Regions:
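Hydrophobic helical h-region of N-terminal Sec-dependent signal peptides
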Residues: 9-14
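Hydrophobic transmembrane signal anchors and adjacent membrane-proximal interface regions, especially
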Residues: 7, 26-28, 169
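Short, low-complexity, disordered segments immediately C-terminal to signal peptides
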Residues: 21-37
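Extended, low-polarity segments enriched in aliphatic/aromatic residues
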Residues: 38-333
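C-terminal motif of bacterial Sec signal peptides marking the signal peptidase cleavage site
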Residues: 16-19
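Bacterial N-terminal signal peptides that target proteins for export
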Residues: 1-8
Length: 333
């Protein structure tokens, strides 16, 4: 069964309903004023399921109506350590099987357990991912360049070279906070996650350097980093077109990213699974869900998002034409 909610109605109904749940909370889409701007039938759809389970992932993928075909990449984060909050391999296995996917990841630019192809692959082994599917460290032989058509900071993006080998991508993201981006969802998973190690330095420094050794001495203002991520996403989306779906799992909602090997404990209860064909809409829906949650544990996550100017990435991505922040929310039962 589906329940269609738009605008302020979605926020009010879901917030009230979630208050009755002990293990899942959610908020929803844009304001009533936004509803007056665009009819609901012209808005991108974000599907939502409260229960976080393998069956729910299969259901929400099917609801999107876009079948993964050809050589399929499933973009995840394998996480920095076993203390990190990366998605459980057993949670995602049926979906990965359904799309006959390869789990893909790239090396980090800051040291740690995933800084080389060998250690990045070993991390995937250690965290149980190679037991459920093939794993491809996409920058194991270097980077490829994708041009950015509309930019302030990045004339091009540097992605793991194997990215170009895939016909379709499932961007399967753990939605949570992030110590630099404010929050991490579909857009961050693409902008940083598909970037090679050199590309990560390039995006993080807004085009100042592609040398990971020089990253920390060249960090820009938060708002510029947010725009840089948007431009990296533009290059990726221009390349992949409509051969992509976006699924965000909002659980273990720490203020810290899965790249943190010792993240702060989650204070906000799990929200559910969100999915869309629009990356801006699905991330906006997750941000709205955090804000609208009746759970008082949301406060530190909201503060993290705002302090790092996380919502600016959504504004800029929308300006670049990557998606919309107005959406309709369809809850699946």
């Amino acid at each position: 069964m589906k329940h269609l909610l738009t605008g302020a109605m979605a926020a009010a109904v879901l917030a009230a309903a979630c208050a009755c749940s002990s293990n899942a909370t959610a908020g929803a889409s844009a304001t009533a004023a936004a509803d007056s701007i665009a009819p609901a039938d012209t808005l991108p759809t974000v599907y939502f399921i409260r229960e976080i389970s393998p069956e729910s992932l299969l259901k929400i993928y099917a609801a999107l109506g876009r079948k993964a075909e050809g050589k399929v990449a499933v973009k995840i984060s394998t996480g920095e350590s076993k203390k990190s909050n990366q998605l459980d391999p057993q949670l995602i296995k049926p979906l990965v099987d359904e799309v006959n996917g390869t789990l893909v990841e790239c090396c980090t630019a800051y040291g740690g357990s995933r800084s080389t192809p060998t250690t990045a692959y070993q991390t995937a082994v250690d965290h149980g991912y190679t037991a459920i599917a093939p794993v491809d460290i996409m920058d194991s032989i270097g980077s490829d360049t994708l041009l950015v058509k509309t930019y302030r900071h990045l004339p091009y993006d540097l992605v793991g070279s194997h990215f170009l080998d895939y016909d379709f991508m499932v961007v399967l993201s753990h939605f949570k906070g992030h110590q630099m981006a404010g929050f991490g969802g579909a857009l961050k998973n693409m902008a940083i996650g598909i970037a090679s190690a050199d590309g990560k330095a390039w995006v993080h420094t807004a085009g100042k350097t592609a040398n990971p050794a020089e990253l920390w001495n060249n960090l820009p203002a938060d708002s510029i980093f947010q725009e840089s991520m948007g431009e990296a996403c533009e290059a990726i989306i221009d390349h992949i077109g409509d051969k992509v779906v976006y699924i965000n799992v909002a659980n273990n909602l720490s203020v810290d990213c899965d790249c943190n090997g010792n993240p702060a404990p989650a204070e906000l209860a799990d929200l559910g699974i969100f999915a869309s064909l629009d990356p801006v809409a699905v991330d906006r829906a997750c941000v709205d869900a955090v804000r609208q949650s009746p759970d008082h544990g949301k406060q530190h996550l909201i503060e993290r998002m705002e302090a790092r100017r996380g919502p600016h990435m959504l504004d800029y991505a929308e300006q670049l034409g990557l998606g919309r922040q107005q959406y309709r929310l369809v809850e699946l039962k």
